[in-house]
Amino acid sequence: MKVVKLSHPNYEYDVHSLVKAFYAEDQVTVITPETKPEKLAELEPQVSLEIELAETGAKIRVGEEDFLWDAETENLADGYKNGLKRFLYRTLSKVTGQKLPWGNLTGIRPTKIAYGMLDEGRSDAEILEFMEQSHYVSEEKALLGIDIAKRERDLLKEIHYEGGYSLYIGIPFCPTTCLYCSFTSYPIAAFRRQVDAYVDAVIKEMDYVAENFQDKVLDTVYIGGGTPTTLEPEQLDRLITALKSKFDFSTVKEFTVEAGRADSITREKLEVLYRHQVSRISVNPQTMKQETLDIIGRKASVEQVLTAYRLAREVGFDNINMDLILGLPGELEADVQRTIEKIVELAPDSLTVHSLAIKRASRLNQWIQENGVSMLHNTDETMKIAAAGAEKLGMKPYYLYRQKNMSGNFENTGYAHPGKYGLYNILIMEEKQTIVALGAGSITKRVFPDGRIERCDNVKDVGLYIEKIDEMIERKKELFAE
C-alpha cells in the first residue's frame, strides 16, 4: 500500500490518480486534514509520500528525500493545479525511473486538449509541443491524440449540437456477469419474468422524450447494456417498433445496437434488427482465447463468436464492430497476436480495443487478491499489436478515452473503416451534445449552449426502475425545465 499525506484536500483526486498511475500494482490511499481521526491514526505511520502545498510552490518528501517546487519560476498560465501535477510527475518519474505514455494527464479524454487547440487554429507542431512540454505526453500518444481530434472534428461537422440530441436505451441484462464488469447488469435467467415490464417502462419513458423533443433533431440512437440481445426476438421487436413509431428517424445518422455477447445472438434476433434498419451492431469476443473466456466468466465460446459474426454477415449487416480487451488475466503478447490474427481474418468494419480497467465494483478485484496483479499483463507491445491489426484491415483511429486504474496506464481506442465510424461513441466522449438516456442505471447529460453540463440518473435496480418510472420521468422534466 502507498499512503500519501497531502496538506490540503483540494487536489486529492488529481494526486491519487497520478500516484496510482506510477504505482499501478499498489493500493493508493491519500490522507488529508479532513480524513477522519481514527483513519489518520491508523495510516499516518505508513506514509511513504508527503506533499506539502504552499502559495509559492510545494514540497514532496519521498522516504528521506525532499523535492522542492518554486512556482514563481514557472509560467502558471494554466493554473496552480497543472503546475503541481507537472511537479508531482517529475518527482515520481525520477523516483521510479518511469515515463508514462500519457504523461500527467489523468482525465478520461486526453484528445480534448488537441481538439480545443485545433478549434483555436493552432498547428500540429504547436499542439505537439504543448502536450510534450506542459503534460509530458510521449510523442507517439500526442500524435495519436492530434490525429483522432482532427478526425472527430470532421465527423462532427454535420451534428446538430444545440438543435439536436442523441438517444441511449439501456438494457441491463446479460447471460452472465463477466469478471471485470462493473456496469449495471443482471443475469437474464433470474430476471426473465421482469423483462416485459421493463420494456413497458422504457417505452413509457420513451413517450415523454418523444413528446417533449419534437423541436429537436435526433442524430444518433444507441441501444446498449448489458446485452440488448438477451431480450427475446418478440421483445426486441416490440421495443424497436415503439421507438421507430415515436421518433422521426429521417434525421438519424446512426442506429446502433450492441448485440455484444455471442451466446445471446440468434438469426431471428439479427433479422429483427436488420428489418428495423439498425445500421451498426457489435459482436464482442473480448479475446479469441478460450481459456481466458472461461476465466472471465464469458460463457460464449470462440466458436460461438465466429458463428454469430458469420450469421450477422449472412443476414446483411455491413457495419459490424468487434470489441477486444487487452490485459485480461493470464494473457501475454502471443495470445493477443493470435486474437488479432483471427480478427483480421474475419475483417469487421470497426474494432474497439480496450485496456483492462480494474473496477472497484467488479469481481476482478477479488480475483487479483487470489492470483496477484502480475497476472494482468498489458504492455506497449500489445497495444502496438492491436494497432497493427487495425492498420492491416485499413482502419483509422477515430475515438479514444481512458479510465481509472487502467492496465498499463494505456487507453481505449476505436478504429474503423472510413464511413463506418461510431458517431455516438465520439459524442459521448466529447460531451458537445445532449444525450437523453432511458432505462435502469442510465445517465442523461444535458449540454447547455455555454458548455455547462447537468446530469440526471435513473435508479440502477430493475424492480425499482419499473416501480418508480414516473419519478424517473419527473427527473428528466426537472433537468429540461429551463
Where are the model-predicted features located?
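Radical SAM enzyme core and accessory elements
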Residues: 1-120, 124, 202, 418-482
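A C-terminal junction/extension of Radical SAM enzymes
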Residues: 28-37, 41, 361-438
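N-terminal [4Fe-4S]-dependent radical SAM core
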Residues: 96-99, 119-167
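Key residue(s) within conserved catalytic/signature motifs
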Residues: 147-148, 180, 257
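Canonical Radical SAM [4Fe-4S] cluster-binding loop centered on the CxxxCxxC motif
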Residues: 162-197
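Beta-strand scaffold of nucleotide-dependent catalytic cores
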Residues: 170, 282, 351-355, 425-426, ...
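Conserved non-cysteine loop/helix-boundary elements of the Radical SAM core domain that shape
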Residues: 185-385
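Short, glycine-/Ser/Thr-/acidic-enriched flexible segments
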Residues: 228, 405, 441-444
